[in-house]
Amino acid sequence: GGEAMMIKLADGLKPERSNSFSGSVDWAFNLGHFSSNLLIEGFYTMLNDVFYLEETGFDETTGTKIQERRNGHGARVYGANIDYKIAHGKEAQLQLGFTVQQSRYTEALAWSSDPDVAPTKRMTRTPDCYGYFTFTSAPLKNFDFSVSGVYTGSMLVGHSAGSGVETPVAVNTPKFMEMNLKLAYDFPVSKSFTLQVNGGIQNLTNSYQKDFDKSWNRDSNYIYGPSLPRSYYAGVKVVY
């Protein structure tokens, strides 16, 4: 729920170690007046004595819930990502990337202390795919803008019993596509002094979690996805 929590280290806790392997191809080329760069990368990571948390009870004095950090058997994280950049000077620049990966424990681990909840090999809060893009342009001498986006694929998130659900459940979250817009205009005051006025919208698509827990016994850890709903902002910047 929303109560405080204490994390203790298990006796004989070993350090988590990893071995990683990766390979990539990086290609720079021109498309007419545009310069481009393409990067393709593959990766594989083996984690040994991987850390995980397990509930062990409550502190008798404060009533604080206690979780213990323990060693699991291991985990594997592997996948591939692609990044692409294309630019035409300062007039227009585009950068985008996408990653596909698998994050799995070698043996299933319990994410809840409830014995009726099945353990899982899938790492929680780790999407199997995610990506981004950023487009910036300065079509006028004193005006520029940018459009960016972040894609987060579905992930597994534990939802503990409380005001939201009566029994613990592992939730496959929805996918999110967060879009952002920023506009800026420069007002030259003198040769060495410029006043910039800017504004924009964060999370233009309002891609945001819709099922927050409420009340005193909420699961305060049941939070996922973009950190803010649709938000507007404006600012002034002095450049000299």
Question: Can you say where each PLM-predicted feature lies in the sequence?
Answer:
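Membrane-embedded beta-barrel scaffold of Gram-negative outer-membrane proteins
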Residues: 12-70, 76, 197
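Gram-negative outer-membrane beta-barrel transporters
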Residues: 37-47, 64-161
